[in-house]
């Protein structure tokens, strides 16, 4: 079904003047002789885009339709409208990723203030070095023993003072206290992009803890099922950076995780203007949480939902949004489509860092998955260094009790 802007765009393409320029198109207004400029990247200078923040206005639709019906020599030729890729920035980010990854990870971990060592004896490996080796190992997707060579290289580069034994990673990931540390590091790693991200999306996805081959099933007739952990994330829709994350068992519910994710993101200093999520997150509590954070929820309602079934003051905002959803479905859809970016984020993680966890128990698997999410954020930062020209500066790690408990255990 075409929305109103698309319908008007087709009318403009058929009845008004559209001129091809070197760097875009001049599109005549539907109601006046004024022209608006749509550049080759798909941005328009009309009030609908500049004031209302519309992502695809009627002038952009007019250009797309114009290119589709343009007749140069009496025949109809379809011309594909494409958007340029910043290949130079992309190539720089990809070719320098490994080197930049180590440097950014080291800078992030420098924000952890460790307590002074007490007593005599051989000094233990610092928490910074343990986390560095753990994230580096997960990023490489190597086994613990094979990753020992990576630790040796990091010592030669002076990124760590001591190359630890291969099982130091397993020891750290098996600690329950490591979970809170990694969750906070994920939030800190996203904060350099808080001036960029104001629109967010939330969802969950499963990561396998086991691997079964088709050969085993075909030969022995054994029916085996994969076991999963579920990652719940809230990410920015522009850069795909993860602002907050929680890990649950595979059958963990989605809806209860939205409130802590939004609260953590808001406390990290992000300006939550809007948040998109699917129907699984539609609840009074979630709507109120997003509103209290200053955001606007774009969460569709299930079929058969009756606004009269939600009474009381707590459901007032939920009912108001229900009426908005029913009366403005075209406008709602224009914002809701940004939710697909969270699926893109999961694809980025699984395609680059894998969708299978190597650890054997739930605590270690949970922390290994958090290391994947942290590694993803660092990769995003590397990309934005070249795309947006940012210079990441990390806020200090404030949770001293977490650091203390890890040192004691």
Regions found by a protein language model. Give the residues of each.
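Short, basic interhelical loop/turn and adjoining N-cap
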Residues: 120-125, 142, 152-170
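Short, charged amphipathic recognition helices of the HTH superfamily
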Residues: 140-153, 343
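Basic, amphipathic alpha-helical segments enriched in Lys/Arg and hydrophobic/aromatic residues
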Residues: 61-64, 330-409
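Helix-centered, glycine/charged polyanion-binding patches within enzymatic domains
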Residues: 279-280, 284-348
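Polybasic low-complexity intrinsically disordered regions
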Residues: 118, 122, 131-132, 139, ...
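Arg/Lys-rich, glycine/proline-spaced intrinsically disordered segments
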Residues: 83-86, 119-122, 304-316, 392-403
């Amino acid at each position: 079904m075409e929305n109103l802007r698309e319908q008007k765009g087709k009318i403009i393409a058929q009845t008004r003047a559209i001129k091809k320029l070197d760097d875009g198109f001049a599109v005549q207004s539907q109601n006046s002789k004024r022209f608006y400029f749509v550049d080759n990247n798909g941005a328009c200078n009309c009030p609908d885009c500049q004031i209302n923040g519309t992502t695809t206005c009627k002038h952009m639709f007019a250009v797309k339709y114009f290119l589709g019906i343009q007749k140069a020599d009496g025949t109809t030729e379809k011309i594909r409208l494409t958007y340029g890729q910043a290949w130079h920035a992309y190539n720089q980010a990809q070719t320098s990723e490994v080197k930049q990854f180590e440097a950014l990870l080291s800078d992030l971990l420098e924000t952890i203030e460790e307590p002074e060592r007490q007593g005599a004896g051989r000094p233990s490996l610092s928490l910074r070095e343990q986390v560095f080796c753990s994230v580096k190992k997960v990023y490489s997707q190597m086994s613990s023993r094979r990753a020992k060579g990576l630790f040796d290289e990091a010592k030669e580069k002076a990124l760590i003072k001591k190359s630890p034994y291969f099982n130091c990673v397993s020891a750290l990931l098996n600690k329950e206290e490591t979970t809170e540390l990694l969750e906070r590091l994920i939030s800190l790693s996203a904060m350099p992009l808080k001036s960029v991200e104001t629109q967010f999306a939330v969802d969950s996805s499963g990561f396998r803890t086991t691997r079964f081959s088709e050969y085993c099933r075909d030969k022995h007739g054994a029916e085996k099922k994969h076991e999963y952990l579920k990652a719940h994330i809230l990410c920015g829709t522009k850069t795909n950076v993860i602002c907050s994350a929680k890990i649950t068992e595979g059958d963990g519910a989605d809806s209860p995780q939205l409130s802590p994710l939004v609260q953590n993101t808001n406390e990290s200093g992000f300006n939550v203007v809007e948040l998109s999520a699917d129907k699984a997150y539609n609840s009074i509590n979630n709507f109120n949480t997003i509103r209290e954070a200053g955001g606007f929820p774009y969460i569709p309602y299930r079929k058969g939902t009756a606004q009269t079934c939600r009474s009381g003051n707590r459901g007032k905002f939920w009912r108001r949004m229900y009426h908005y959803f029913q009366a403005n479905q075209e406008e709602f859809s224009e914002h809701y489509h940004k939710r697909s970016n969270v699926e893109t984020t999961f694809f980025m993680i699984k395609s680059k860092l894998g969708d299978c966890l190597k650890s054997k128990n739930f605590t270690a698997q949970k922390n290994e998955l958090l290391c994947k999410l942290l590694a993803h954020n660092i990769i995003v930062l590397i990309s934005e260094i070249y795309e947006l020209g940012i210079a990441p500066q990390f806020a200090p790690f404030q949770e001293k009790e977490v650091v203390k408990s890890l040192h004691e255990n």
